[in-house]
Amino acid sequence: MTLFFSHRLFTVWRLKCGVMDIGWPSVLPAAGKKYQIELPVVHEEELEEQFVRGSGPGGQATNKTSNCVVLRHIPSGIVVKCHETRSVDLNRKRAREILREKLEVAYKGEESELLKMKKESMQKKQDKRRKVNENIEKKRRFKEMLNSKQEDDKST
């Protein structure tokens, strides 16, 4: 039996004692994704994939394993290199996600939802930083005012 509350589907299990137990939604959004944007579909025959040795810290473990994925989208010529994890499978998945995001920006340009979200995020960070700097400046002026009053009180 499935119930529908607001925007989620809940599965109901009937227990032997006759009590109904409502479980988690049967379909969950991807973990860690705060946005749902329709990204372009990438077909495997349009991709050229290579596995190369990664770079960066890690010493011998990094130097002798080829778990860095280089993915090239043949029609557009976009190249993505992913070496985020030690797992080739996870790097392959992540490289495809990055490629889809880059294709979204390349095809839609300024109309891209990802680009709009990135600009919005940067604007929020700048506003927050500006407010922090304003508060620091106010505190500095307040301390100067207190110090000058204390000096005036001492001199009189």
UniProtKB/Swiss-Prot annotation:
Residues 114-125, 132-156 have a biased composition (Basic and acidic residues). InterPro entries: Mito_Transl_Release_Factor, Pep_chain_release_fac_I, Pep_chain_release_fac_I_sf. Gene3D superfamilies: 3.30.160.20. SUPFAM superfamilies: Release factor. It is found in: Mitochondrion. A motif (GGQ) lies at residues 58-60. Residues 44-108 are annotated as: GGQ domain. Residues 114-156 are annotated as: Disordered. The GGQ domain interactS with the peptidyltransferase center (PTC) of the large ribosomal subunit to trigger nascent chain hydrolysis. Interacts (via C-terminus) with MTRES1 (via S4 domain). Associates with mitoribosomal S39 large subunit, peptidyl tRNA and nascent chain. This is Mitochondrial translation release factor in rescue. It comes from Danio rerio. The gene is mtrfr.
